[in-house]
Amino acid sequence: MIDDPLLLDACMHDAIELAQRGRFEVEPNPRVGCLLLRDGEVVARGYHEFYGGRHAEAMARAEAAQKGVRADTAVVTLEPCSSPQGQDGKKTPPCTEALLRAGIRRVVIGAVDPDPRHRRLGIQALTQAGVEVLEGVAARACEALYERFRRTVQLDRPWLLAKWAMTLDGKTAAPTGEARWISGPEARRRTHELRARCDGVMVGFKTAQIDDPELTVRLVSGKQPVRIVVDPLGEIDDDSNLVRTARQAPTWLLCSEEVDARRSGVLQDLGVQVIHVPTAEGPRRLHLQQAFRELRRRGLRRVLVEGGGGLVAQMFAWRCVDQVLAFVAPKIIGGRLSPTPVGGEGRPFMAEAWRLEEVQHETCGEDLQIAGFVT
C-alpha cells in the first residue's frame, strides 16, 4: 500500500473527475467516484452512473474482478454507504460490504457523508472490520462536490426534475392545445428512459385533462413509476387513461382536504390512491411543500414533472424545482394563445430570472437538449 500524500491526492482528484460523469443522472444521490489500487497502481475505476444503479465502489470492484486483480486500497470521494438495501428506499447493497468482499485493506476518503442519519457509519463499519481508513484527502475539492447533496438532505422532499418539450419560439402546444408531437422520436425515447429512472411522474390537472396521457414507460424496458396528478378539486375524468389504468400502474391523486369522501371513494374504488393535502392561496392551489413532503414520506425520492405550465410556475414560485431538462425542437408555432413551459405571472425583471448552473447542451436527434440545476 502507498503512503505518498501527493499520489493519494492525485488519485482523489481523478476520482472526482469520475464522479462528475454521473451529473444529471444520479440526483438526489451524491456523485461518487472510486479508484482501486494495488501497490500504488490503479487497477479499476468506478462511478455512480444513474439513480437506482450500482454505486461507484461496486462498479470498480466488478472491473477488478473481471480483470482478475485483487486491490489493496480504495480511493473514494465520499464515505462508503453502510445501510442495507431497502432501508429508506435504498436500491443497492451497502458499499462497505463490496469493499470488504474485494479484500480492501485501506480506504481513502475525501468527504464524510453529510447525511446525519448515515454520517460516519460507513467508516465505523470499515474500522470494525479491521480496514484502515484515511480521511480528508483533497477534502476541500470533495466537500465542494457535495454542496448540492448537502442541501438535498435538508429538503425532506423528493428531488424534483421539471421536463418539457418546446418549439424554437418557446411554445409547448399549438393555440388549439394540440401538442403531438413537438419533439422527435429520439427525445421521446429519452423521456421514457428518464421515467424509468424516477420513482414518480407528475402532471397537473389541466395536462391530465387536455393531453389524457398514460405517463408509463413504453419505449424502453424498465420499472413503471408512480403516476401523480396534482388535482386540488378531484376533477379528473373517471374515463381518463390515468384512471382507467390505475389498477395496472400505480396512480396517486394529490387533492385538497375539501374534496368530499364520496368523490374520494369513487376514485379509490377505481384504483386511484387519493392523498389529501392542505391548500394555499385558495381552494385551487395546494400547499406544494406539504404535498411533496408527503410524497417523500411515502418513499418517493426522485420525481419527474412533465407539466403543465401552471404547475411548473407554482413549483418555481415555491422554489421546488431542482433540475430542468428541456427539449427544443426546430419548429415555430407562434401565437399569443400558445402555452409556454412556465406559466403564471413570471418574473418582473430579467435580473430576477430563475437561472440554471452546470448547464449542459447536446443534440438529441433533430432536437436540442438543455439540462441544468436551478440555482
Where are these regions (language model features)?
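Proteins enriched for Cys/Gly/acidic motifs involved in redox and nucleic-acid/cofactor modification
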Residues: F24-V26, G53, I123, V137-A165
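Enzymes that bind and transform nitrogen-containing heteroaromatic metabolites
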Residues: M1-E27, A44-R45, A64, G68, ...
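Generic signature of intrinsically disordered, low-complexity segments enriched in small/polar residues
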Residues: G40, F50, R54, F149-T152, ...
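Helix-turn-helix
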Residues: G33
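Zn2+-dependent cytidine deaminase-like catalytic core
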Residues: L36-A141, V226, W252, E257-V259, ...
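Aromatic side chains
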Residues: Y47, V75, Y146-F149, F327
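A broad detector of the eukaryotic-type serine/threonine protein kinase catalytic domain
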Residues: Q20, E79, I104, I109-V112, ...
